Swiss-Prot record:
This is Olfactory receptor 2L8. The chain crosses the membrane at residues 25-48, 57-78, 100-119, 139-157, 195-218, 236-258, 272-291. It comes from Homo sapiens. Belongs to the G-protein coupled receptor 1 family. Keywords: Cell membrane, Disulfide bond, G-protein coupled receptor, Glycoprotein, Membrane, Olfaction, Receptor, Sensory transduction, Transducer, Transmembrane, Transmembrane helix. GO terms for cellular component: plasma membrane. InterPro entries: GPCR_Rhodpsn, GPCR_Rhodpsn_7TM, Olfact_rcpt. Its main location: membrane. The gene is OR2L8. Residues 1-24, 79-99, 158-194, 259-271 are extracellular. Glycans are attached at N5, N88. Odorant receptor. It is a multi-pass membrane protein. It is found in: Cell membrane.
Amino acid sequence: MENYNQTSTDFILLGLFPPSRIDLFFFILIVFIFLMALIGNLSMILLIFLDTHLHTPMYFLLSQLSLIDLNYISTIVPKMASDFLHGNKSISFTGCGIQSFFFLALGGAEALLLASMAYDRYIAICFPLHYLIRMSKRVCVLMITGSWIIGSINACAHTVYVLHIPYCRSRAINHFFCDVPAMVTLACMDTWVYEGTVFLSATIFLVFPFIGISCSYGQVLFAVYHMKSAEGRKKAYLTCSTHLTVVTFYYAPFVYTYLRPRSLRSPTEDKVLAVFYTILTPMLNPIIYSLRNKEVMGALTRVSQRICSVKM
């Protein structure tokens, strides 16, 4: 493998786990999760599009989250499945750059979008009379396009860097996708300045939004506590707890992975943590948002009845 790495520009993805007897089990499990994520997120997007009761800022943002998750998991899992089926773990230099770009762009966009969703709930509960003004269609579009553009600019900057640094060591990336920190460890130049920019990016895309989300929900919980309506209080708590669950699943492993000093990082640990925000979160998000949401379940019933009536 060492000779291959020195004469080829391709990278080698070592995968999630070393080869073992239970490879087939992991393959089936990951493909199953991928299909669940595909069905769940597509269903959420179509449901919000087809049911007029869900044409609100909250669900408009949720449909974008599902779109991001759909693309997010599709950037990584199909390549993993292909590697297992064909036994070829190589990925071209350009292919690695493309995968890295989409991973960073979608990851950054999702982090910012989750902050926008927290702001939406903050305005809806703390300033209900101003909700339609502060969360107009124009504001929602600006939030969404801003998330995509900022995430893409950040991704472009990091991808251009990793594609231009010299790789004179083994080209075997100890990961299951082209993760920038894992790629940088293969460089034959000092990258401490760049690692500082990674820390800065992680702070901008993870720490600042998380602080904003925490402050928003601190205000929300205070407002909910003083609500007179028990039903309104229950609904608000349910909505907030759902979003906080999603935020925790996404931010916690990301923050722990990217904000740790290099000396404390472990490739095995990084790969396991990456499973949470690249594979599990896209599958769990539509389930979490729909399982206890009466509006989503009601919309599902209405759309199903409409489809059945058309067939009859």
